[in-house]
């Protein structure tokens, strides 16, 4: 019988972080590096736990090389060929593989390709198993299969939005569970399927479930600005995956388009018409597109955006009195709000000029 849960679920836009007394004198005093030991692989991670999404307009080899300079992670999209992987490995800095994951679906072809790439590139340490609906039994079985084949690799898996499924994926072999259904800027699942979960509440609940098993969670989607990234960490996310904020740069995928003397880059969801026609030839007759395609202003080199995101996180830590990023979730108190910002002069803002690549 249908039922309604009456407890309100919250998104990033519904809250702000309350400022608290702080002993920090400067944002420069904040330490963003985290160190994790993963439950199943037993491997140790050290870095800044911001992650570029495994979309083909974001998770590129070029993005991985650029973000590695900041100790930021990249999940490489799954549509690179084995030969492209080998060419990248031949030219990449060895330490890039400390901040990089190979992504895979769960089909037989995906399994074959995953095995081939890992055989050719033994330096790979991370595997990202990515499906839109992480609640299927076939997905759980695939995680078990990968864990059995690669016991020392760290496995990211998702997406789900509820605690009981987080526990299921961790107990099946996942080290990091990706949390988020429908919050992304170019995702339309909530409109097409009517399914989803507000991202802040999803992260709060899933982090609680994962941490009880010594597992980890990655908030995936819904961050439209650096403040949202800080809120995700404050809600208990161990990693925060970003798509749209990393799109539109020199290192991003997507076609560069000129219109009326201005430059734009194409950005689209991986379940959009654009993505399915590009990678599969058409949209299967039994399904609907659950993503959209947009043109976003060209942003130049990604390093400027990285500085903006990390600066925002440092500022949030300073306001809440968290000297280390790991303290932010302990220091965070969220207040519900009816309005976040004063948008009086938004139509008159001077646009940022993209910084050229070096």
UniProtKB/Swiss-Prot annotation:
KW NADP (keyword) present: yes
Sequence positions that bind K(+): 182, 184, 187, 190
Alphabetized InterPro entries for the sequence: Aldolase_TIM, GMP_reductase, GMPR, IMP_DH/GMP_Rdtase_CS, IMP_DH_GMPRt
Catalytic activities: IMP + NH4(+) + NADP(+) = GMP + NADPH + 2 H(+)
Keyword terms of this UniProt record: Metal-binding, NADP, Oxidoreductase, Potassium, Purine metabolism
Cited NCBIfam families: GMP_reduct_1, PRK05096.1
Subunit and interaction comment: Homotetramer.
Protein name: GMP reductase
Biological classification of the source: Eukaryota, Metazoa, Ecdysozoa, Nematoda, Chromadorea
